[in-house]
């Protein structure tokens, strides 16, 4: 609610307008796309082409992701490549400034970020190059700023896919492989990250971002609840 201090009236409509103005006025940060995985679940498809360059509905998966990001007001994208990374050479997207950083060997999701740390902005939206998740970036980023956490994770409240436990807008447990009766949400694949998190937990060897950072930041991750569906290129189908 917005409170008028002269009359002490509380007005939901005015509060909504203030929030909308704040969201509209945000300068959107860089998007960082993890696009260096081997894509083994796709079998023969990814032996000759990176997963995020596979054509889906007439254009590469990466183009779909960048089209959404651009429509949300993002203008800069850092794309982290690895497997067959040379195939990204010459890739362009209208309205977006693209920077590609290729790792010389498979370093895991965390290692890929560390390999590109000099190109990262102080805040960035972290995406997976094989997921299409059309969540409202402006609202997500506004929520990140409002809660003043260094990491905000988009969470879908799904019991079928659950891989985390959240409570009072905080993530307390996460597992990529284990199942727990306490889990009540699923990481949707879009996060807002402060570069300071990478500086704190980063390693010079191969390491997993999600399996390292999420458990160690238990209770410090803001859970942004949003039921926007996402599509994962996990199988050829």
Language model feature labels by segment:
Residues 3, 82, 101-103, 154, ...:
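Conserved beta-strand termini and adjacent loop/short-helix elements that scaffold enzyme active sites
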Residues 29-33, 41, 55, 59-139:
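Conserved N-terminal catalytic core of the sugar/cofactor nucleotidyltransferase
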Residues 38, 49, 84, 131, ...:
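A generic "binding-loop/recognition-motif" signal
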Residues 44-47:
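Conserved catalytic-core motifs of eukaryotic protein kinase domains, centered on the activation segment
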Residues 52, 97-99, 220-222:
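Conserved beta-strand segments of alpha/beta enzyme cores
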Residues 124-125, 132, 138-145, 158-159, ...:
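Catalytic-core segments of class I nucleotidyltransferases/pyrophosphorylases
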Residues 147-157:
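A short, conserved acidic/glycine-rich loop-to-beta-strand motif
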């Amino acid at each position: 609610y917005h409170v008028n201090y002269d009359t002490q009236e509380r007005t939901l409509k005015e509060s909504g307008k203030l929030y909308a103005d704040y969201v509209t006025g945000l300068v959107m940060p860089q998007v960082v796309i993890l696009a260096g995985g081997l894509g083994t679940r796709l079998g023969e498809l990814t032996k000759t082409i990176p997963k995020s360059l596979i054509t889906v509905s007439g254009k590469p998966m990466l183009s779909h992701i960048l089209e959404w990001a651009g429509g949300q007001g993002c203008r800069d994208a850092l794309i982290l490549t690895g497997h067959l990374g040379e195939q990204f050479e010459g890739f362009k997207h209208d309205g977006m400034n693209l920077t590609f950083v290729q790792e010389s060997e498979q370093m895991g999701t965390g290692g890929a970020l560390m390999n590109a740390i000099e190109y990262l902005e102080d805040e960035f939206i972290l995406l997976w190059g094989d997921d299409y998740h059309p969540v409202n970036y402006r609202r997500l980023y506004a929520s990140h700023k409002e809660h003043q956490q260094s990491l905000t994770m988009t969470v879908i409240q799904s019991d079928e896919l659950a891989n985390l436990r959240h409570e009072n807008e905080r993530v307390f447990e996460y597992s990529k492989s284990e199942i727990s009766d306490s889990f009540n949400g699923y990481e949707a694949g879009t996060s807002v990250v402060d570069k300071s998190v990478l500086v704190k937990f980063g390693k010079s060897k191969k390491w997993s971002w999600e399996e390292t950072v999420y458990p160690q930041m238990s209770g410090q991750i803001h859970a942004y609840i949003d039921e926007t569906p996402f599509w994962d290129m996990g199988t050829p189908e």
